[in-house]
């Protein structure tokens, strides 16, 4: 499990676009804590403080202790909205987590390792990542930083499916009916075709 991060916030009673804009002018980020069966809790935090946490590795899979006035909440980041130009954090949603031992759905990053030893990449292939995160059900006290995927023995043209991932004890994939592809090693010609398709689309958009 990741080391728990800490963050200080405040309850807020004014909602809506104008209120959110006023908070942002003060350097604060409006946010909401969600949990099934409870009324959403509206909070705000200092943008510079939550932005520091956002830049840390494995932010999405790290439990945060959020101190709001005289209350403490254990939360997981759910969604972050950034300004499209300034990348200022406009809004953040949290999920309230239960005590240790309870199960929690969490989005965990996939770390593709062994690229320097990959047979396919050594032969001129290119790692095409389809999924960078996987949805898991994990005990709150055993949420992994990431799920490692070794691609050392993956050859050109081979696909890596979700079933290949080795999950920590107690963690399970959120139910899925398909064994979907999370990455593949494509050859030079396939890579070139993708780049040419992208260039053609860019040219069409500019007309």
Curated annotation (Swiss-Prot):
Keywords: Ribonucleoprotein, Ribosomal protein, RNA-binding, rRNA-binding
Protein's recorded name: Large ribosomal subunit protein bL25
One example of a Gene Ontology biological process annotation: translation
Subunit field text: Part of the 50S ribosomal subunit; part of the 5S rRNA/L5/L18/L25 subcomplex. Contacts the 5S rRNA. Binds to the 5S rRNA independently of L5 and L18.
The keyword RNA-binding is assigned to this record: yes
Family membership: Belongs to the bacterial ribosomal protein bL25 family. CTC subfamily.
Natural source organism: Orientia tsutsugamushi (strain Boryong)
GO molecular function terms listed in the Swiss-Prot or TrEMBL record: 5S rRNA binding; structural constituent of ribosome
Pfam families in the cross-refs: Ribosomal_L25p, Ribosomal_TL5_C
Function: This is one of the proteins that binds to the 5S RNA in the ribosome where it forms part of the central protuberance.
Gene Ontology cellular component list: cytosolic large ribosomal subunit
